[in-house]
């Protein structure tokens, strides 16, 4: 196939992550993302290398016989969901098959192990407790939009007023915010021009308590930046801004006094909403970073407080706008219950006199789950804010046998005097650094648990562990993200006798 060629084919299978294998009528194999087994699709070839072709999806010519589920009206346009048109059981089959194939390839005949059936999320819809919506426009110089990125686009935004993976409170807050800033004619931050005010809307809602935090993330751009320039340069900038305002009705700049009025008005709009949950805090965060990420460069509380509480497996957690916390609270209970069952098995006292390392511990959720049944837990996490949150939450739950250390696992392991009896691994998507994995293996613990959000990384690290004297006892997937391509996997390993 040639780059730029347009063709059609049938999707035979989907490999992780989101790689549809399409066979053309001429028998050629092409990888096309965002497809579902059984579909017939048209695509444009955008990459050919060493005989392997990749294509960009143009159109679903014929739906798959499996696609029988209702979808939100943004499905296919929004980049959030891929499998929403499939019944949930079909989604689970695809994810389990993908992971099983990777694990089988990694392990081969090195050991006998048990692959348990995938565990589903308690909720398939309205399961997310956090959303980061982006401001932008759906097309160049179009009306202000607030929502998710269009599939395959870094710039275009789809207003997702019908989003199904969040509940009605998220949608109400999103639409009220969008209507308010459209009315005020405020411009969004343009990533290429590096101008504008509105960046993101962060909404968090606790599933168990119903408490809500809303945080508006903006730049600090205003007329003050213009006044600091030399007269000639200032005149040019002012002229450009005025021209932009003429082209774009919502391109208003924001000075300090106007910002106070603007934020006060937005706060009042939110407080007037009739929500199922309880609004605990309305916040404003400043972020002048060039990167298109939610970053905290200073947060102001406009109403209430900057935290709320969520409950997980009988534990209580204080969560701020930027705390790391699993985005599916009920699914997290399934994930951590699975890990605890793998660890304890039929012996609830097996850790009673043991020290556990929780490596890549985040805010210490797993550590606190194990603390009541072991002698001591040592958590290691590179993000200092997460470590502080872990300490605060452990105190909140009256767990005094937890120690949390900030730093890179590779370096921090050299500073811990007490050796582990058991190790829990929950690394980021890219898995464990090879040198850190060597140090972990050298402890020689009898058992380890590996929790992975990216099965390709898990498969790679399992190959190293198998080569260094460990065997895999059992593996189980947990679906934390219904309607998407993502899946968590838990693996239990033991030292070869």
Feature roles, as predicted:
Residues 129, 210-212, 353-354:
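Nucleotide donor/acceptor-binding cores
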Residues 204-206:
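Structural signature of eukaryotic scaffold interfaces centered on beta-propeller domains
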Residues 201:
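Flexible loop/N-cap segments at domain edges
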Residues 1-74, 151, 403, 411:
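Terminal RNA-binding accessory module
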Residues 20-25, 147-150, 215-217, 390:
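Short, acidic/hydrophobic/Gly-rich beta-strand patch recurrent on exposed beta strands
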Residues 38, 166, 328:
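Short, conserved phosphate/pyrophosphate- and ester-handling motifs at nucleotide-, phospho-/glycolipid
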């Amino acid at each position: 196939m040639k780059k730029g060629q347009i063709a059609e084919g049938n999707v035979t299978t989907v490999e992780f992550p989101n790689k549809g294998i399409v066979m053309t009528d001429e028998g050629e194999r092409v990888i096309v993302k965002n497809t579902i087994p059984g579909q017939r699709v048209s695509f444009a070839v955008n990459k050919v290398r060493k005989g392997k072709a990749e294509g960009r999806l143009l159109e679903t010519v014929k739906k798959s016989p499996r696609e029988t589920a209702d979808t939100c009206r943004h499905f296919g346009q929004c980049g959030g969901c891929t499998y929403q048109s499939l019944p949930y059981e079909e989604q689970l089959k695809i994810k389990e098959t993908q992971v099983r194939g990777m694990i089988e390839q990694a392990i081969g005949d090195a050991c006998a192990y048990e692959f348990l059936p995938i565990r589903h999320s308690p909720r398939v819809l309205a399961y997310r407790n956090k959303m980061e919506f982006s401001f932008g426009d759906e097309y160049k110089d179009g009306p202000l939009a607030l929502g998710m990125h269009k599939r395959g686009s870094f710039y275009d935004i789809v207003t997702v007023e019908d989003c199904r993976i969040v509940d009605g409170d998220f949608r109400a807050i999103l639409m009220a915010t969008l209507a308010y800033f459209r009315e005020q004619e405020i411009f969004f931050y343009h990533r290429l021009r590096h101008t504008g005010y509105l960046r993101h809307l962060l909404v968090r809602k606790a599933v168990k308590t119903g408490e809500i935090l809303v945080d508006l993330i903006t730049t600090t751009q205003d007329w003050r930046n213009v006044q600091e320039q030399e007269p000639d340069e200032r005149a040019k900038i002012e002229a450009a801004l005025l021209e932009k305002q003429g082209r774009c009705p919502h391109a208003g700049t924001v000075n300090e006094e106007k910002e106070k009025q603007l934020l006060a008005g937005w706060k009042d709009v939110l407080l007037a909403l009739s929500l199922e949950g309880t609004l605990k805090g309305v916040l404003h965060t400043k972020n002048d970073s060039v990167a298109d990420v939610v970053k905290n460069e200073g947060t102001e509380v406009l109403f209430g407080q900057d935290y709320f509480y969520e409950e997980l497996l009988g534990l209580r957690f204080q969560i701020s706008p930027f705390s790391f916390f699993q985005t599916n609270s009920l699914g997290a209970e399934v994930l951590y219950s699975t890990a605890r069952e793998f660890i304890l098995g039929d012996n609830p006292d097996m850790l009673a006199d043991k020290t556990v390392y929780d490596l890549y511990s985040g805010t210490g959720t797993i550590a606190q789950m194990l603390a009541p049944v072991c002698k001591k837990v040592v958590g290691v996490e590179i993000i200092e804010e997460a470590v502080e949150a872990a300490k605060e939450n452990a105190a909140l739950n009256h767990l005094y046998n937890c120690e949390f250390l900030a730093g890179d696992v590779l370096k921090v392991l050299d500073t811990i005097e007490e050796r582990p009896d058991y190790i829990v691994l929950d690394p980021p998507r890219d898995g464990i650094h090879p040198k850190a994995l060597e140090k972990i293996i050298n402890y020689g613990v009898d058992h380890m648990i590996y929790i992975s959000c990216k099965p390709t990384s898990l498969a790679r690290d399992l190959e190293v562990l198998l080569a260094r004297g460990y065997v895999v006892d059992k593996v189980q997937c947990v679906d934390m993200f219904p309607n998407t391509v993502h899946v968590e996997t838990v693996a239990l390993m033991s030292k070869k006798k």
